[in-house]
From Swiss-Prot:
Native species: Rattus norvegicus (Rat)
UniProt keyword terms in alphabetical order: Cell membrane, Cytoplasm, Hydrolase, Membrane, Metal-binding, Nucleus, Protease, Thiol protease, Ubl conjugation pathway, Zinc
Catalyses which reaction(s): Thiol-dependent hydrolysis of ester, thioester, amide, peptide and isopeptide bonds formed by the C-terminal Gly of ubiquitin (a 76-residue protein attached to proteins as an intracellular targeting signal)
Function per UniProt: Deubiquitinating enzyme that plays various roles in the regulation of the immune response and inflammation. During TCR engagement and activation, translocates into the cytoplasm and deubiquitinates its substrates LAT and TRAT1 and prevents their lysosome-dependent degradation to stabilize the TCR signaling complex at the plasma membrane. Plays an essential role in the selective LPS-induced macrophage response through the activation of NF-kappa-B pathway. In addition, promotes that antiviral immune response through targeting DNA sensor IFI16 to inhibit its proteasome-dependent degradation.
UniProt-recorded name of the protein: Ubiquitin carboxyl-terminal hydrolase 12
Superkingdom field: Eukaryota
Bias-annotated ranges (Basic and acidic residues): 146-157
Domain named USP: residues: 39-369
Stretch list, region Disordered: 146-168
Signal sequence bounds: none
Quaternary structure (record): Interacts with WDR48. Interacts with WDR20; this interaction promotes translocation of the USP12 complex to the plasma membrane. Component of the USP12-WDR20-WDR48 deubiquitinating complex. Component of the USP12-DMWD-WDR48 deubiquitinating complex. Interacts with PHLPP1. Interacts with RBPJ. Interacts with CBP; this interaction blocks the acetyltransferase activity of CREBBP. Interacts with ITCH; the interaction is more efficient when both USP12 and WDR48/UAF1 are involved and may mediate recruitment of the USP12 deubiquitinating complex to Notch.
């Protein structure tokens, strides 16, 4: 059995080497971006959900730059962030241009910190993205708090942040955080009340044969609060019918959009996949911004897509397609291939609902031009 495993691993390594060599030739020495590296990630038993998100984040340049800058800081105790920084640094400093890296240290730490990921079952890529970004933000805030307590902040001995105040935003927030405003208008007195809510990614409902722009408009559709759902108006001092809608008040540097492709079916007692065809353009402008939004005409470029292949949340596979400089790459665990921009259309989804098994965009990463 052990000999068979060794032979299998050797064959896999040979395949990886051949794939890497082919990729380097296809891009060509003159076109290959300076100081760029394209490395696949070894799958440690259904860790494609993790590999695909890590590849997408690596090619979100503002995020990559911050993680690499963190690596250059004085050594800290091991955390998920230090393991991520080590992985990104390992990719960025390879002598070879293309190849394969085992993210073993990161996976080991992830499984140690969160029992949800401590098994060999398929996990949800969006849940992992959410967990990773929030964990990194928590680590950075805790480190800043410790620095303040130790009196190492440059702004002197004055601690402007008491225990009950909101922590300062981290670079995770600076890159991914946007703000939604929830507007409610009383239909009796016309008073508008609004409540702001921060987000690191937006989850949007999907419909058949639509676009991501349509999904975002649906996200901001006006909802009527009536009957038992009436709104308590402070001005009227009673429950009234009202209109409620959600709009984007602050656009993030990188807009992460999660397409809600998994729906719980009561008759089946399980989640099933909505393989609907949802077009996501290479360029995006949001039209559901609030009146007081800063830079409402901000343009975004698609930089990465996490794709779900299969028929359900706990079955199937995840891959990533990313834009690097002027071309697109597909990362399928340890395999890396160059693809045409037109090939992205293959990941929109299916026009027919008959076949649920599909390769469809699940998390989209759009980067602001400014």
């Amino acid at each position: 059995m052990e000999i068979l495993m060794t032979v299998s691993k050797f064959a896999s390594i040979c395949t990886m080497g051949a794939n890497a060599s082919a990729l380097e030739k296809e891009i060509g020495p003159e076109q290959f971006p300076v100081n760029e590296h394209y490395f696949g990630l070894v799958n440690f038993g259904n860790t494609c959900y993790c590999n695909s998100v890590l590849q997408a984040l690596y090619f979100c340049r503002p995020f990559r730059d911050k993680v690499l800058a963190y690596k250059s800081q004085p050594r800290k105790k091991e955390s998920l962030l230090t393991c991520l920084a080590d992985l990104f640094h390992s990719i960025a400093t390879q002598k070879k241009k293309v190849g394969v890296i085992p993210p073993k240290k990161f996976i080991t730490r992830l499984r140690k910190e969160n029992e949800l990921f401590d098994n060999y079952m398929q996990q949800d890529a969006h849940e992992f993205l959410n967990y990773l970004l929030n964990t990194i933000a928590d680590i950075l805030q805790e480190e800043r708090k410790q620095e303040k307590q130790n009196g190492r902040l440059r702004n002197g001995d004055v601690d402007s942040e008491d225990n009950n105040s909101t922590p300062d935003p981290t670079w995770v927030h600076e890159i991914f955080q946007g703000t939604l405003t929830n507007e409610t208008r009383c239909l009796t007195c016309e008073t508008i009340s609004s409540k702001d809510e921060d987000f690191l990614d937006l989850s949007v409902d999907v419909e058949q044969n639509t676009s991501i722009t349509h999904c975002l408009r649906g996200f901001s559709n006006t909802e009527t609060l009536c009957s038992e759902y009436k709104y308590y108006c402070e001005e009227c001092r009673s429950k009234q019918e009202a209109h409620k809608r959600m709009k984007v008040k602050k656009l993030p540097m990188i807009l992460a959009l999660h397409l809600k492709r998994f729906k719980y079916m009561d008759q089946l007692h399980r989640y099933t996949k909505l393989s609907y065809r949802v077009v996501f353009p290479l360029e995006l402008r949001l039209f559901n911004t609030s009146g007081d939004a800063t830079n409402p005409d901000r343009m975004y470029d698609l930089v990465a897509v996490v794709v779900h292949c299969g028929s359900g949340p706990n079955r199937g596979h995840y891959i990533a397609i990313v834009k690097s400089h002027d071309f697109w790459l597909l990362f399928d665990d340890d395999i890396v291939e160059k693809i045409d921009a037109q090939a992205i259309e293959e990941f929109y989804g299916l026009t027919s609902d008959i076949s649920k098994n599909s390769e469809s965009g699940y998390i989209l990463f759009y980067q602001s031009r400014d």
